[in-house]
């Protein structure tokens, strides 16, 4: 790769393929490579413009005649838990979250594999091997962390370490927030609502770090896989005019920062 291509991002468009979220539709993506010394700055800028990261690639939907994928970010400092979310936090009071460098482990892959087999056995990631998983975690040129969620043990208060791993989240640290790249959990623990718990934990982490937002990726109205992202209010959704605030009272059309 030349110096020019490292410093000046080149954007590419994928060929149409079946949409994994809305039956009968096709998706296309525009993408670029996140490499070089300014990869972090570029990732910040692109995330603010609706892109997502996957390994060293930043991508955004660019579908013909469809704008259903809407980038959403939770306003961390103003977020208030619902009654149901408070119940989920209480249900997981025995869980401790440990932030680590993005180093893949066999323990993580075991949970990841079980999660895919139970929840996404026919999805695009279903055939990922342990080497594929390692690439997903390690292939990052931006500030990335992996948050491991473990059950507390009698020694956790002393050592700060938990016991069995039951969930994990691959997370980018941006200039204005945390971006949840991918999360997974032990399917045998589904009664804990660990997906919701990890989002709530990231909102709390963003607050402690003084970061205004938690980026959740794409909200898709009418998609059972993605509709849950609309439950975390207040949030902002990216429109053609900029980020639009959504709260319990509805939509506020004035563009946000």
UniProtKB/Swiss-Prot annotation:
Gene name for this UniProt entry: bpt
Family listed: Belongs to the R-transferase family. Bpt subfamily.
Reaction catalyzed: N-terminal L-glutamyl-[protein] + L-leucyl-tRNA(Leu) = N-terminal L-leucyl-L-glutamyl-[protein] + tRNA(Leu) + H(+); N-terminal L-aspartyl-[protein] + L-leucyl-tRNA(Leu) = N-terminal L-leucyl-L-aspartyl-[protein] + tRNA(Leu) + H(+)
GO molecular function per UniProt: arginyl-tRNA--protein transferase activity; leucyl-tRNA--protein transferase activity
Principal EC category: transferase
Gene Ontology cellular-component annotations: cytoplasm
BP terms from Gene Ontology: ubiquitin-dependent protein catabolic process via the N-end rule pathway
UniProt protein name: Aspartate/glutamate leucyltransferase
Keyword Lipoprotein: no
Organism the protein comes from: Rhodopseudomonas palustris (strain HaA2)
Keyword field: Acyltransferase, Cytoplasm, Transferase
UniProt-listed PANTHER family: ARGININE-TRNA-PROTEIN TRANSFERASE 1, ARGINYL-TRNA--PROTEIN TRANSFERASE 1
